[in-house]
């Protein structure tokens, strides 16, 4: 672990520093510590611009460990693939990992089964599940799965729209960053 001090534009400084790390760890602000101004979107800006994985720890996280029970939110994208492989050192040491896919209806096969098989070949204790959205958003379905599994880490690909479109429409990454159910490991 290394701590650094730098001055300047917060986004530029963090992005530059993150490029020389294995993992950038940020705490989510809360209460009087809610970021304002340019640091408001720092976690999403950092994951999109640094080329490095980012771990966002919720302000109210009280767990004693991170990475023992892991949920991977899988959609088959290059971002999800990147997150999966960036988190491999954590996944290989985890007690239990669940790959979830989320969709509006039942499927004949579990879309994340191939991904789970790939992880099992790396010695990961893994299972796969398909979660039905029902009357909730994709982000809510993911959060429910994290809580139901007792996960202490959520791994996912940070898929981003332009800031304007994301402000208007939201987005799964945006929703998870605003209300993470557990520490959140993101890659882009």
Question: How would you label these PLM feature ranges?
Answer:
Residues 5, 74-75, 103, 133:
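Conserved residues at beta->alpha junctions
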């Amino acid at each position: 672990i290394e701590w650094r001090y730098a001055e300047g534009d917060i986004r530029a400084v963090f992005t530059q520093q993150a490029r020389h790390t294995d993992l950038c760890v940020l705490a989510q602000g809360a209460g009087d510590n809610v970021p304002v101004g340019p640091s408001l979107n720092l976690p999403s800006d950092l994951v999109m611009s640094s080329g490095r994985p980012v771990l966002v720890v919720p302000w109210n996280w009280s767990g004693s460990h991170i990475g023992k029970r892991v949920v991977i939110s899988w959609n088959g994208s290059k971002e999800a693939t990147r997150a999966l492989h960036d988190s491999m050192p954590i996944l290989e040491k985890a007690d239990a990992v669940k790959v979830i896919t989320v969709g509006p209806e039942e499927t004949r096969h579990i879309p994340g089964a191939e991904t789970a098989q790939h992880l099992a070949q790396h010695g990961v204790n893994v299972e796969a599940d398909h979660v039905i959205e029902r009357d909730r958003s994709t982000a809510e379905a993911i959060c429910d799965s994290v809580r139901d599994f007792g996960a202490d880490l959520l791994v996912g690909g940070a898929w981003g729209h332009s800031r304007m479109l994301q402000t208007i429409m939201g987005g799964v990454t945006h929703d998870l960053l605003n209300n993470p159910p557990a520490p959140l490991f993101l890659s882009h």
